[in-house]
Amino acid sequence: MMLFNSVVTLAAAMLLLPGQAMAGTYKGFSMGANRADGACKTQADWKTDFQTIKGWGKGFNAVRLYAASDCNTLANAVPAAKATGIKLLVGVWATNDAHFGAEKAALLKAIKAHGTAWIAAISVGSEDLYRKDITPQKLATEIYDVRGMVRQYNKNLKVGHTDTWTAWVDGANDVVTKACDIAITNGFPYWQGVNSKTAIQKKTFQNSFWSVQKHVKAVNSKAAVWVGETGWPTAGASFQGAAPGTTSLKNYYGSVACWLWAKPDTSGFWFTAFDAPTASPEVEKHFGVADSKRKLKFALPC
């Protein structure tokens, strides 16, 4: 998740009827690979997570992962996803050549073991351009590299990148946009310092998504725009004019998630399903729509 003082984004998936996802689009959560106690999730942990979000009855059908090899994410999450009917947006870390190689190897191993039907799409990197951890040119090369690898097994797999709104509308990064089948955008009005009431009234989130969509389509008309993260914390420190709170999360979710998941042509992932007690800083522990014991903080309207 990024922290930056600028208008940020969100947009996502789908509904034919309330709680029913439209075929071809994905609706779910971005989820880390660590349990509440900080240990790596086991296959059983992933299965419980997936069963829980499906049990909420809102048509959640996908989860975004941040890594392939770290915490043996794919080795544990893929069997659990197959068992529960969840599709995975696979994250592949792009920085550090050795790490990138390990991520590719883990993804390839999972494909050889399980095929490709469990894959929603693949994101090479996450907010690397925002952090300036990699050059746009090198990142584009890595996207082409991963696409070439996975399309030996399924020529229709979509490969892209996840980054902040400001990164996607920055022309210096257009080489990455041109390399992507999907441009996955993250957006947090909270980290812009906008209070939830204003963010809802001014459509901060929606306007920034539309800005991303406009720029991406001008650069690469074939690229789809998905949402990787948005959310609101329920505890922790305020950020400028934005304060955490369960009511703020409930209102923001009702406005943004329900707008997002009514879109028939956009897949999207909320940050996040469950609180993460070992995250830092303190406010990062509290972005779940449910607590660390998987109990919802409010009744989900969509």
Predicted segments with their positions:
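N-terminal carbohydrate-binding/catalytic regions of secreted carbohydrate-active enzymes
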Residues: 26-110
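Aromatic- and acid-rich polysaccharide-binding/catalytic face
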Residues: 84, 120, 126, 163-207, ...
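Substrate-binding cleft of extracellular glycoside hydrolase catalytic domains
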Residues: 75-158
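Aromatic-rich peripheral "rim/lid" segments of glycoside hydrolase catalytic domains that contact
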Residues: 34, 238-246, 260-302
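Aromatic-lined carbohydrate-recognition surfaces of secreted/lumenal glycan-active proteins
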Residues: 150-169, 218-230, 265-278
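Active-site beta-loop-alpha junctions enriched in small/polar residues
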Residues: 32-34, 66-68, 93-97, 124-129, ...
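Fungal secretory targeting signals
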Residues: 1-23
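Hydrophobic faces of well-ordered beta-strands that scaffold small-molecule active sites
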Residues: 27-31, 61-65, 86-91, 120-124, ...
